Amino acid sequence: MNDVDASIEPKRIKEVRAYVVKGGGADYHDQSSEHWILGYIATPISIYPEYRASRASWGLNVLGSVVVEVESSDGEVGFGISTGGYPAAWIIENHLSRFVVGKYVGEVEKTWDQMFKATIYYGRRGIVMNAISAVDLALWDLMGKVRGLPVYDLLGGPVRDELTFYATGPRPDVAKSLGFIGGKLPLIHGPADGIEGLRENVRIFKEAREKVGDDFLLMYDCWMSLDLPYAQRLLSELKPYGLFWIEEPFIPDDYWSFGALANIAPPTLVASGEHESTVHGFRLLLELGKVNVIQPDVTWVGGVTPMIKIAALAEAYGAWVIPHGSSVYGYHFIITRVNSPFAEYLVVSPDATKIVPQFHPLLRDEPIPQNGKVRLSRKPGFGVELNRDLLVRPFKST
């Protein structure tokens, strides 16, 4: 038998701190105006001409990053990040912190449940879930550091030796040359651009297919921008060119349009979920929406704790779980799941031709794909360090 001193009390959390950061980091939309991610890309609001030319014009990049540190009674610190800036920091300091301080390190399920239920009346999605995500990720990071284990070991251990990636960005030809297994293009034109815009979307995809060949996965990210008739026609026009999946064609709550599109999509897959929240929301997406691939963002959906349930639900429906972006936070989860066959790398270099860390300059030692693959380290927690020089703490818990 192992000798265990039952009199040793587990470590407790003594403080929660929330910070904001400007310029990249967790909010990767917070970029210069020349960045491809802020350019002419279809969005729900691009039906209005004044908000069509740039995603910055309607404020996609206004929130900024939020960073949470949780400190144990012996001074060990874990941290997590999300999008949310000042509003999320205020919620964390003034509401969520009461459910964290005093808890034992490792009480992640109870803490998450209390944070979620205490914010239902004004939360459930959006910025509140982002705030909960940052806290939850900090708790998992701390638990790994206290136990001397990477988070993926806390989740059951890896099911593969390394992660394989596809790349999101406007240059799938470059992605192929860098060793990625696929590329996901941003859809440029939405319904407001008419039949000419649709034809241009098809032309862009066809040209990309000609450059990368047939042995390369090619997808379209529609970012909630389409209506059902447009999506049906786009899907039909693209079938000759090997569209692997069509992503997030509709707003998250329109499960019925997802279901209607899924009925005619095969062999193309339907993917969605980066803007979905809660296991109940994903149940609707799987039951009514009939999606083949769900894409929760670990830094937006509530953190690692709800991801465990969402992934189990997806497995019951025979669906893949390929989280949206989320870098190292997604990597530690994906490597433990049989139904997560590969991962997304979001190309955040301005012209989408260079491989750089997604959350730069906020994280240090952030792994990036080499020849389209990543082998995770054995460092405890999420295995990255925080660049504290960038942090500003605008509020303190009351």
UniProtKB/Swiss-Prot annotation:
Q: Where does substrate bind?
A: H29, R55, E344
Give me the reactions it catalyses.
Answer: L-rhamnonate = 2-dehydro-3-deoxy-L-rhamnonate + H2O
State the UniProt keywords alphabetically.
Lyase, Magnesium, Metal-binding
Locate the site labelled Increases basicity of active site His: D297
Q: What is its EC number?
A: 4.2.1.90
InterPro entries found in the cross-reference section: Enolase-like_C_sf, Enolase-like_N, Enolase_C-like, L-Rhamnon_dehydrat, Mandel_Rmase/mucon_lact_enz_CS, Mandelate_racemase_C, Mandelate_racemase_N_dom, RHMD-like
What does the record give as cofactor? Mg(2+)
Q: Name one GO biological process term.
A: carbohydrate catabolic process
Cofactor annotation comment: Binds 1 Mg(2+) ion per subunit.
Keyword Magnesium set for record: yes
Annotated Mg(2+) binding lies at D221, E247, E274
Q: Where is this site: Transition state stabilizer?
A: E344
Q: Is Metal-binding included in the keywords of this UniProt record? A: yes
- Which SUPFAM superfamilies does this one have? Enolase C-terminal domain-like (SSF51604), Enolase N-terminal domain-like (SSF54826)
- Active site annotation, chain numbering: H324
Which GO molecular-function terms appear in the entry? L-rhamnonate dehydratase activity; magnesium ion binding
Gene3D superfamilies the record matches? Enolase-like C-terminal domain, Enolase-like, N-terminal domain
Sum up the protein's function in the record's words.
Catalyzes the dehydration of L-rhamnonate to 2-keto-3-deoxy-L-rhamnonate (KDR).
Query: Any miscellaneous information on file?
Result: Reaction proceeds via a syn dehydration.
The entry sums up its family as follows: Belongs to the mandelate racemase/muconate lactonizing enzyme family. RhamD subfamily.
Designated name of the protein: Putative L-rhamnonate dehydratase
Coding gene? rhmD
